[in-house]
Regions:
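Membrane-proximal, lumen/periplasm-facing interface regions of secretory-pathway glyco-
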Residues: 6, 298-362, 372-375, 379
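Transmembrane-helix motifs of polytopic, lipid-linked glycan transferases
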Residues: 54-75, 113, 117
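Transmembrane-helix signature of polytopic, membrane-embedded enzymes
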Residues: 67-90, 109
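Membrane-interface transmembrane helices that cradle and orient dolichyl/undecaprenyl
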Residues: 72, 114-130, 236-243
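Short helix- or helix-capping micro-motifs
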Residues: 84-89, 137, 141, 155
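Short acidic/glycine- and proline-prone juxtamembrane loop motifs at membrane-interface regions
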Residues: 93, 99-106
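Short hydrophobic alpha-helices at membrane interfaces in multi-pass membrane enzymes
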Residues: 117-138, 169-173, 177, 253
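Transmembrane-lumen/periplasm boundary regions of multi-pass, lipid-linked membrane glycan transferases
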Residues: 148-245, 317
Length: 379
């Protein structure tokens, strides 16, 4: 929050603010939760950067807490829980998501919360927790459709891992019903608008998907976790796979299934799977705990390396540098560059519009290049 007022609105935020002024049951590119929270911010704070960004900041904090709690469910002690929380807090994608009010921060939290519930059920066998899982999944799908993919992948993973009994019971079915209830408004809106999201996804797949996207996707995954801790999530994937618990292995299956799906068929951006690294880091922290305990200095060195690599990430993903000096980070993180220059852009457009003769101005139509430009003008 200390940096929330620096630079300006991100183009996604400009779009969400406009969506908040015209609330609907859903939208072409995402469900209603993000615009709804933007609407709450408008009512409470007006058009305010800190007021809009308080929600993703809170979501990021809760995701860090969830990372530590997931490690506890996997059997980790305080050291593993601390490492999991630190690993989550230093994820570049979470640092960036905490600063921009779009769907990403809430998506990270929802996935982490559902993984926490699944990990707990896998450890305790208490199926009543599926009710909480359904609520989490429902809120997640109200934010972003990716939660549907994650939930389905978990079910497939459970079946592949021999966990049919754990997902075929009345508590799971009740939880699934809760999740579906949250999805009904979105489905109703999509049906009324010729399934616009599916059409958009197909267009993205044609533009960015297929085999040509695999290389970019694989390399991009290396940047989801701070570089010094990248090997920890790999250890976590191995830990889950060898755990012997069907639901824990299902979480590993979900990662693998979605990795392939997003890489090959959806033209997905590299951060679409970022939320999975929260639970993989938590599992990895548990997996390497004995190794860290053998030599106390190892944890200190690991945290020092994480601090150094995170410092570099902070310069790239957060508005720390003067706005005039962010050009060198733009290729790595164009999102930060998209928070600069909107006020000048609007003044330029306004000046041109006002320079028109009154009769021409009355019928003039302004065409923009993207939703960010449109949102800036409408704001």
């Amino acid at each position: 929050m200390a940096l929330s007022a620096r630079y300006g609105f991100d183009r996604d935020e400009l779009y969400f603010l406009d969506g908040a002024r015209h609330l609907q049951a859903s939208y072409v590119d995402q469900p209603v939760l993000g615009p709804l929270l933007a609407w709450v911010s408008l009512k409470l704070f007006g058009v305010s950067l800190p007021g809009l960004r308080v929600w993703p900041a809170l979501a990021a904090w809760a995701t860090v807490v969830a990372g530590g709690l997931i490690a506890r469910e996997f059997g980790g002690g305080k050291r593993a829980q601390l490492l999991a929380a630190i690993g989550t807090a230093t994820m570049p994608v979470l640092l960036g998501a905490a600063h921009v009010a779009n769907t990403t921060a809430y998506e990270l939290l929802a996935w982490a919360a559902l993984a926490l519930v699944v990990a707990r059920i896998g450890r305790t066998g208490d199926f009543r927790w599926w009710l909480a899982g359904g609520l989490v999944a429902g809120l997640g799908v109200a934010d972003d459709h990716s939660m549907s993919f994650f939930a389905i992948a978990l079910v497939i993973g459970a079946l592949l891992s021999g966990g049919r009994r754990m997902i075929w019971n009345r508590w799971f079915l009740a939880g699934a019903a809760i999740a579906v209830a949250f999805e009904v408004p979105d489905l109703w809106w999509q049906a009324q608008h010729q399934w616009a999201t599916i059409a958009m996804t197909r267009a993205l797949n044609q533009e960015n998907g297929g085999l040509a996207n695999i290389g970019t996707w694989v390399v991009g995954q290396l940047g989801m976790v701070t570089l010094a801790l990248a090997w920890v999530w790999v250890a976590g994937l191995r830990f889950l796979w060898r755990s012997g618990r069907p639901l824990w292995r299902a979480i590993a299956w979900a990662y693998g299934l979605l990795f392939v799906l997003f890489a090959v068929t959806t033209g997905a951006k590299t951060y679409y799977l970022a939320a999975a690294y929260v639970y993989l880091l938590a599992a990895g922290a548990v997996a390497i705990d004995a190794w860290l305990q053998a030599r106390p200095g190892r944890l200190r060195h690991l945290l020092l390396a994480a601090a150094l690599t995170t410092a570099v990430a902070v310069l790239i993903v957060l508005p720390v540098l003067p706005a005039a000096d962010i050009g060198w980070t733009y290729k790595t993180n164009p999102t930060l560059g998209e928070t600069v220059g909107w006020s000048q852009f609007v003044r330029t457009v306004d000046g041109v519009w006002k320079s028109l003769p009154p009769r021409q101005r009355a019928s003039a139509v302004i065409f923009t290049g993207d939703y960010g430009e449109a949102g800036a003008i409408r704001s």
